[in-house]
UniProtKB/Swiss-Prot annotation:
Annotated protein name in UniProt: Multicopper oxidase LPR1 homolog 2
Enzyme Commission (EC) number: 1.-.-.-
Keywords: Copper, Endoplasmic reticulum, Glycoprotein, Membrane, Metal-binding, Oxidoreductase, Signal
Cofactor remark: Binds 4 Cu cations per monomer. The Cu cations are bound as 3 distinct Cu centers known as type 1 or blue, type 2 or normal, and type 3 or coupled binuclear.
Signal peptide: 1-24
Sequence positions that bind Cu cation 1: H149, H479
Record function comment: Multicopper oxidase that may play a role in the maintenance of inorganic phosphate homeostasis.
Main location: endoplasmic reticulum
Tissue expression: Expressed in leaf blades.
Domain Plastocyanin-like, first and last residues per copy: 285-355
Compartments where found: Endoplasmic reticulum membrane
Cofactor: Cu cation
UniProt record, GO biological process: cellular response to phosphate starvation
Length: 598
């Protein structure tokens, strides 16, 4: 039934293509010209930038912290990704066109002190990258639609960056869920940790983020962090924002103009992968360091690429937080997997490098991930750390930092307890293909499109168990807005194709799993161990292909543990969403609305 409905919609393609003339399919900067051979770019010639920092709070007389008010715009500007690459046209966040950067400025907020941000759209009438008019997408009469989501933020849905709350330059056009041009309010009443902000416009998220609309956001608690004594200060506590891009020889960003299934989707492809790895806006940069501890807050801001990160010389990462929440105890690893939109907060001690003068951060994850059995991924450099204790330009401040044996107290945050769940939901992940080919046409959650009526209505103050059934060949990083969750277990299905055939024949969502014998398909299936650094509270979790992942999802504040109400009305406004954070999937229906009730 779902396939028939989709094919019926595809009959409208000829009509929908007319929408391309409105927003524009992108000019020559988005797809014409000769693709750059990345081998012609010398690695490690650009220094890793520290993005501009903006204080998300004010300081009143007497040193009292008060709410901060920021105005951050979206601009079309030029950005140098590499010394030998011509400047690239991008969309970027900043306080002006001249100061806008890719990534955007790092917003530094204080726990419990609100940050108000007025987001302004100064983007041009046409997008410079191609987009697909056959997707459910924002398509105004003129201008580039944009809306900002604070990923990991605990905020009212009116400030959450709803995909249909987009707006163009000067608010000339707005989406159906747009309410007012007032500043977004971020209460910052959540644990200290790492967040990021990015575009979230309907059907254009992958394109706008590819163009450069992303940035880091921190929530700090000075008292808590002083007690932890982790590496601190701008020199020793750095954000690393990683993503991949392709370029043309003239420096332009490259995005495909023709899709894998052009008769269905003229431009959309299942995943975007670039051959150039970018860190903080520079291709394969370097960072000069001393032999001491550094804290690295590593965000994977790629559209679809997974990074499996390791350090040359066998250096360790010590994980102190995952996504937006500290772990209970530090977890040492030699390598770890980071999905799109995941954040790993790690400490690296370059004392362990011995006599080495350089350490390379590298990745060996296949693309797409996990790929076919037997695929061997190439190890690619990400950036280089140049160790020089004699460099007078580096801070000589002695290293008094440490990594404590315990990062949070047992009573600080709520403990995961499956017994508190008030109900069980089944969330099934589907990928549909064109008949006669293996090429995807769209991806659904619970066999429903984004525009179908809301089916998930959790109650504030409760927790739920979600069994996420991945019936596809891809690993999908699941993100739930507002909520935090813990992965309790992950089990392989014994016969994915049989279960998928049954469930698709029924045209059902996750609820049809029982009728199709889900437990029988799980019996004897492999149990996957959740990595230690991913056993805490998270807002993104990797759902392996052919598995059922059980999540305990918390629709209430994490701290204090007995909290039941958020500091705002969660039932008001446009509502929240949950989705796959592979942006190409999210833009093609792998996202569902969620309405929280009181």
């Amino acid at each position: 039934m779902e396939k028939r409905r989709f094919l019926g919609v595809c009959l409208l393609v000829a009509v929908l293509v007319l929408r391309a003339a409105v927003l524009g399919r992108g000019d020559d900067g988005g797809g014409g010209g000769r693709l750059l051979d990345p081998g012609k770019l010398e690695m490690f010639v650009d220094e890793l930038p520290d993005m501009p920092r903006m204080r998300g709070y004010g300081v009143a007389e007497g040193g009292k912290l008060v709410a901060g008010n920021l105005t951050i715009g979206m601009y079309e500007t030029m950005w140098k990704f590499h010394r030998d690459l011509p400047a690239t046209r991008v969309f970027a966040y900043g306080t002006s066109k001249e100061t806008a950067t890719v990534p955007g400025p790092t917003i530094e907020a204080m726990q419990g002190v609100p940050t108000y941000v007025t987001w302004t759209n100064h983007l041009p009438p046409r997008h410079f990258l191609p987009w697909d008019p056959t997707l459910t997408a924002a398509a105004p009469g003129s201008g580039v639609p944009a809306v900002v989501h604070l990923h990991g933020g605990v905020q009212h849905s009116g400030s959450d960056g709803h995909s249909l709350a987009w707006f163009t330059a000067g608010f000339a056009a707005t989406g159906p869920r747009f309410s007012s041009p007032a500043a977004y309010e971020y209460p910052n009443q959540q644990p200290p940790g790492n967040l990021w902000y990015h575009d979230h416009a309907m059907g254009l998220t992958r394109v706008n983020i590819l163009a450069g609309l992303l940035g880091a956001y921190r929530v700090a608690s000075p008292a808590e962090e002083a007690a932890l004594n982790l590496p601190s200060g701008e020199a020793f506590d750095r954000n690393l924002v990683l993503f991949d891009r392709d370029f043309l020889a003239d420096g332009s960003l490259f995005m495909n103009r023709t899709g894998n299934n052009p008769s269905v989707h003229p431009q959309w492809q299942p995943e975007y992968f670039g051959a150039v790895v970018v860190a903080n806006g520079k291709a394969w940069p370097y960072l000069r360091v001393r032999r001491r501890r550094y804290r690295l807050r590593i965000l994977n801001a790629s559209n679809a690429r997974f990074f499996r990160l390791s350090l040359s010389g066998g250096l360790r990462f010590v994980h102190v937080a995952s996504d937006s929440v500290y772990l209970a105890r530090p977890v040492p690893t030699r390598a770890f997997l980071l999905a799109p939109s995941e954040i790993a907060d790690v400490v690296v001690d370059f004392v362990e490098s011995g006599n080495a003068t350089a350490i390379v951060l590298r990745s060996d994850a296949p693309a797409p991930y996990p790929g076919d059995p037997g695929d061997k991924a190439e190890t690619v450099p990400v950036m280089k750390f140049v160790i020089d204790d004699d460099d007078d330009a580096l801070s000589t401040e002695p290293d008094t930092s440490s990594v404590p044996a315990r990062l949070t107290s047992p009573s600080q945050y709520a403990k995961p307890d499956a017994r508190e769940a008030v109900l069980m939901r089944r969330i099934a992940m589907y990928e549909y293909t064109k008949e006669g080919t293996d090429e995807p046409t769209h991806l659904y959650l619970n066999a429903r499109s984004y525009m179908d009526p809301v089916t998930e209505t959790p109650r504030e103050g409760t927790s739920e168990l979600w069994d996420v059934i991945n019936l596809t060949d891809d690993n999908h990083p699941l993100h739930v807005h507002l909520a935090l969750f813990v992965a309790l277990e992950q089990r392989s299905l014994r016969d994915v194709d049989d279960l998928k055939e049954c469930m698709m024949a029924r045209g059902s969502g996750g609820g049809g799993a029982d009728a199709c014998g889900l437990e029988r398909h799980l019996a004897g299936g492999r149990k996957h161990v959740v990595p230690k650094q991913e056993r805490g509270w998270k807002n993104v979790f990797k759902v392996r292909p052919g598995t059922v992942t059980r999540l305990l999802v918390r629709f209430r504040p994490l701290s204090p543990p007995d909290s039941r109400r958020f500091p705002f009305d969660v039932a008001a406004g446009p509502g929240y969403v949950y989705h796959c954070h592979i942006l190409d999937h999210e833009d093609n229906e792998m996202m569902r609305p969620m309405k929280i009730v009181r």
